[in-house]
Curated annotation (Swiss-Prot):
Keyword Transferase: yes
Name of the top EC class for this enzyme: transferase
This protein's name: Ribosomal protein L11 methyltransferase
Gene Ontology cellular component terms for the protein in this record: cytoplasm
Length: 258
């Protein structure tokens, strides 16, 4: 029996879209999207909770029960270009001569739609070299781990503190026929070994905490890709040895070396 969720549609102003995105990212909420009609901008949000957060004050215009499969299939029912030369496909469409990531519909982070995921993936594609060992810290759906493996990484370890995300990552890794080790871990607590590249797409305050121990898990000349940094939190990283800085909308991604 498929698990039921609550789908809500809210009316919001264009000016509040970025504010809502930041709020959801800080809360770890990714199961939403926006659409626009002549009547205005609408937010579609799916939650396991019958009553969403009390301080979410936008006007509710519609509510219904749905399943996780149903709503995300509606959202990403066709292949789309994730980053340059890389496509995401929720099914098994024929996409010739392209690198394709198959994502099973679910409510874990990382459908490939969020700006922070795209920034992290773009930098991963640029800096990953054949045979590198990669750690995906806060792996969500496993999208970055799968990309790393398809780009030629040797070993990939994916960790997340959310069991639901880990289950989703396992399913997606199997769907893509790649080898990725996946574990439940609160940041780096259940991580061992050393890596040529660490990629982490999580909120800024958690990234700061993780940075304290990251050098222990890096090989010589290893690099770190950090994404999920909102403009207002960028100052927390200005003291680091930043090799590259990319920005889109209000989101930032950094490549750093220790």
């Amino acid at each position: 029996m498929k698990k039921k969720f609550f789908e809500r549609v809210y009316s919001i102003s264009k000016e509040d879209v970025e504010k809502v995105e930041e709020y959801f990212f800080d809360k770890g909420i990714s199961n939403y999207y926006f659409y626009e009609t002549k009547e205005g901008v609408f937010l579609v949000l799916v939650s396991e909770k019958k009553n969403f957060e009390e301080n979410f004050s936008y006007k509710l215009v519609e509510e219904r029960e749905t399943s996780s499969d149903e709503w995300i299939k509606n959202l990403i029912s066709k292949p789309f270009e994730f980053i340059d030369g890389v496509y995401i496909d929720p099914d098994y469409h024929e996409i010739n001569d392209k690198l394709v990531i198959r994502i099973t519909p679910g409510l874990a982070f990382g459908t490939g739609l969020h700006t922070t995921t795209k920034l992290a993936a773009t930098l991963l594609k640029k800096y990953l070299r054949q045979g590198m060992d990669v750690l995906d810290l806060g792996c969500g759906s496993g999208i970055l781990s799968i990309l790393a493996k398809k780009l030629g990484a040797s070993g990939v370890l994916a960790v997340d503190n959310d069991k639901m995300a880990v289950e989703s990552a396992i399913e997606n890794v199997e769907k893509n026929n790649v080898e990725v080790e996946i574990r439940v871990s609160d940041l780096l607590k259940n991580v061992d070994g050393k890596y040529d590249l660490i990629v982490s797409n999580i909120i800024a305050d958690v990234l700061v905490k993780a940075l304290e121990d990251m050098p222990k898990f890096l090989k010589k000349n290893g690099i770190v890709i950090l994404s999920g940094i909102i403009d207002s939190k960028l100052y927390l990283f200005e003291h680091l040895n930043i090799v590259e800085h990319r920005r889109k909308d209000e989101w930032n991604a950094l490549v750093i070396k220790f």
